[in-house]
A protein has these predicted regions:
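PLP-dependent enzyme catalytic core of the Aspartate aminotransferase-like
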Residues: 8, 25-28, 358, 367-400
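N-terminal "arm"/small-domain region of PLP-dependent enzymes with the aminotransferase-like
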Residues: 12-71
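Active-site C-terminal subdomain of aminotransferase-like
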Residues: 39, 228-311, 324, 400
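Conserved N-terminal alpha-helix of the aminotransferase class I/II PLP-enzyme fold
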Residues: 58-112, 119, 134, 142
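Conserved PLP-anchoring active-site segment centered on the Schiff-base-forming lysine
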Residues: 121-137
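Active-site phosphate-binding strand-loop segment of PLP-dependent enzymes
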Residues: 143, 154-211
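Conserved active-site segment immediately N-terminal to the catalytic lysine
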Residues: 204, 218-229, 238
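Conserved PLP-binding catalytic core of the aspartate aminotransferase-like
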Residues: 319-355
Length: 400
């Protein structure tokens, strides 16, 4: 049962392709938080590149180069076309401004927690963070190991069920930078818009789990990073973008050469051997996004999918959404069983998950810090899968 978003046929309707279920079925509806679902067209084109990479960055219909993407040198002209094309698409499709350098690094967002703190911290200045959950806490912990770190806002008191009010400028006025996590995968919260830091303090964003899900004011951030394995591609690639003037700044302390952003900018994402296959898949995903109508078209479908699921939760007598109105993520919908004593809630949750898995809904178990359930409905997740889940939830409730 189930399926993914259809490939964009030549000359076909982009919006229709976003809404349709692929003719190539999947055994399960994949609600995994990541690595996550990818478009069927990307699978097919990536498989073709494993057999033989095509010229011009694996352009459709281009001549083969005689080698697989898995074996070709990262210093070769064919691969340079891949990485350059991916970089240009990050500007074109995602809206990363030309004032910022795009990098494709490894180590995931977890490595960026440390790298950004090493590179962006200025001597004698603290770093400021907004705490919205597990991943911001991990970033804070890395910063604390390097110097004074301020937590200038937090929603911990309500178990991260909302985005806290943006901190007053005075609270971070003397900081090297202000860091926020713009979508919180575990708790299902999201900034409605990228905020504007004041006083010239650089804004740093971890936008891993909603990168490419809608138009965003990415120019407001001096530095941003996103693990690819949500909306942008497979695991093993991290998209980083950094305002070019920051590359010239001297860090507060010694930073190993390979951990300097300036190192990777000087030899654009080629200082050491990159994840060549991962960068190619990221490029193919960005091409799929562009051909599907770009971020406005993708955002419209994502909004519709999330609205259907939240409406079902708000109408339910059995389930309750974790995230508060105004802070709800369009990518990661979290909810729990409602009302009953804890033991009964846990029993009901186990019953729901067991029946959901048997019905073909995979990856719905929530993180232990929230409990209950989580449905990750990234760009490539089909609207039909949300419709099927809503119907299943209603039927489950009717049978109680």
């Amino acid at each position: 049962m189930g399926g993914n978003l259809g490939a964009v046929a030549a000359g076909g309707s982009a919006l229709a392709s976003l809404a349709m279920v692929s003719a190539k079925p999947a055994k399960l509806w994949n609600f995994s938080a990541g690595p996550a679902i990818l478009p069927p067209e990307v699978f097919e084109r990536a498989a073709d590149a494993v057999h033989e990479l095509r010229a011009e960055g694996h352009a459709r219909g281009a001549k083969g180069v005689g080698m697989s993407i898995l074996e070709i040198s990262h210093r070769s002209k064919p691969y340079e076309a891949v990485t350059f094309g991916a970089e240009q698409l990050c500007h074109e499709v995602l809206g990363i401004p030309e004032t910022h350098q795009v990098l494709f690094l490894q180590g995931g967002a977890s490595l960026q927690f440390a790298m950004l703190a090493m590179n962006l911290r200025e001597a004698g200045k603290p770093a400021a963070y907004v705490d919205t959950g597990v991943w911001s806490q991990k970033a804070i912990a890395e910063s604390q190991g390097l110097g004074e770190t301020l937590t200038v806002a937090s929603s911990a008191a309500t178990n991260y069920d909302r985005i806290p009010a943006f901190p007053d400028a005075a609270s971070y006025a003397h900081a090297s930078y202000l860091h926020i996590t713009t979508n919180n995968t575990i708790f299902g919260t999201e900034y409605a818009e990228i905020p504007q830091a004041e006083g010239g303090v650089p804004l740093v964003i971890d936008f891993s789990s909603h990168a490419g899900s809608r138009p965003m004011a990415l120019e407001r951030a001096a530095f941003g990073y996103a693990g690819a394995q949500k909306n942008l591609g497979p695991s093993g690639v991290t998209l980083v973008y950094i305002r070019k003037d920051l590359l010239a700044k001297k860090p507060a302390a010694h930073v190993p050469v390979i951990l300097r952003y300036a190192t990777h900018a000087k030899e654009p994402s080629l200082y050491n051997t990159p994840n060549t296959f991962g960068v190619l898949v990221l490029k193919l995903v960005l091409e799929w996004m562009r051909d599907a109508g770009g971020l406005p078209a993708i955002a419209a479908v994502n909004e519709r999918k999330a609205s259907k699921l939240y409406a079902a939760l708000d109408a339910s007598q059995v389930f309750r959404a974790h995230a508060q109105l105004g802070s709800r993520s369009r990518m990661n919908v979290t909810w729990t069983a409602n009302g009953a004593p804890e033991a009964e809630r846990e029993a009901l949750s186990e019953r729901f998950l067991k029946q959901a898995q048997a019905a073909g809904f995979d990856g719905l178990k929530g993180h232990r810090l929230v409990g209950g359930f989580r449905a990750s409905i990234y760009n490539a997740f089909p609207e039909a899968g949300v419709d099927a889940l809503v119907e299943f939830m209603a039927e489950f409730e009717r049978r109680l």
